[in-house]
Amino acid sequence: MELLWNDLSVLRLIHRSTEQVEVAGSIPPPGGCRAAELLDCSAEVEISNCKTETGKLNFEGRLCITIAAADETGDTFAFVGEIPFSHCTENADFAAGMLSNALPAVAVLDMRLAADGAAAFSANVNIDFIVTSAAPVRVLSGVSGVADMEIKSMQCRTARRVEIGSETIRFSEELSSEGADSVLSFSAQISVRDTAIENGGTSVSGIITLNALLKTSDGELMQLTRGVPFRESLSAAAGADEIYTVAELKNVSLRALGTEFSLLAFDADIDFRIFGIRRSVIDIPTDAYSPSLNFSCMYEKMTVANACGGSFAQHSLRENLSVPDGMADIFAALNAAARPIATNVSIEDSTMTVEGLLFTRIIYRSSSNRIYSFNDDVPFVLRMAAPSEANFAQLRLNASASISGGSGRTAQVSYNLDVSAEYFSESAVSAVAGVAETDNSNDADGKSTGIILCNACAGEDAFDIGKRFGVPSQRVRELNPDSAEPFKDGDKLLLFV
């Protein structure tokens, strides 16, 4: 017998997981400087390449470390290092050409002062990734010469994320900062808060949050926390629903223009990617039989992946952080920096709950004019609306921290947390991918023949009854015109076999 085929266009979820990569190294201070104490350490991570091969997924990226330190005289300075890394995860289902999407986040960051004055660090990077395949799936559509073959199908709604526009824009802004002479370290984070169609174009708006440790001409430390709004008009193709935008900052710089101007110059490239959702409905064959030909179905199990759109939410909190035992009291709290990490994400009843930690670093000055720093972990829980069909999400977390007060053994810190989410759903389906001839696939109830009165099971339809007894489903309907499908448990059906 010759099998007839149909190719389904469906996005399949191959694998999703979170991999942890350890990155370690040391960063020497700039020439002429020797660190006596490390005050702060911040890190940014970027995945530059993510590609599938047969049986494996390869990651390549870089970790950028910024260290703020003090020498033996108490003078402060900063230095930067970049460490490349690579990682490979193996899976027998991976194949070349599959689609992959990876989001990295620094989960753990430790630093210590090495004997040679360099800053030794170790970091754990979490890589949240999804691997999908858009290759057509071959399914059964019939058997040549078997006219009475019946195929049962289910309608499957698909929603595929498509990129409808991308653009890189150079963004520049001058910020006022009284007394700032130099920038020791800073972080810049971008959050897209709205994407809208306006006047035939796409308007994207949001905020860039800057957190900087600055130094005055007198050697004093000061903190700058600033939100810089942006609004850009971009081009995007039509024909997609529920558009949203993902943005990344690259080639970022922040520099002081001199104490006489009291200004900081911020520059960055913003990579915008606009996504939309294109929906369709496909028929997936789930079962088949023929009254005249004995065969059994062969199935291919797959997980259909659908995009559910994106959303944005904000969360604020205030915490009192205590100075560890053995350290001097706070005379002046100088700087707070926070790095967020999600420890648990769940979606239930159209609500996403995110639990996590804000890894916080505090720098302060004691009454003896010495600079100290300490770490603390602040837990958080936030909830935000999620699409009803969503099963999981990929998150981008941005956090800013600022000193709102501090003295004695306590520093008061205010946090702002931005959450950008891309939602997805997954559903398992078994499709008929072939048949194999058998001798008894259509034998039923001990090969009963004649007039039969059978009991239906709950949820069965004429196809199920027809397959069980080897008769056309249309005959089942004709003999039982008053029985509605799907049948109820115990419904009595008349058959001629």
Task: Give, region by region, the residue ranges found by the protein language model.
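Primarily a LysM-type cell-wall glycan-binding module
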Residues: 439-478, 483-497
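Membrane-lipid interaction segments
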Residues: 1-448
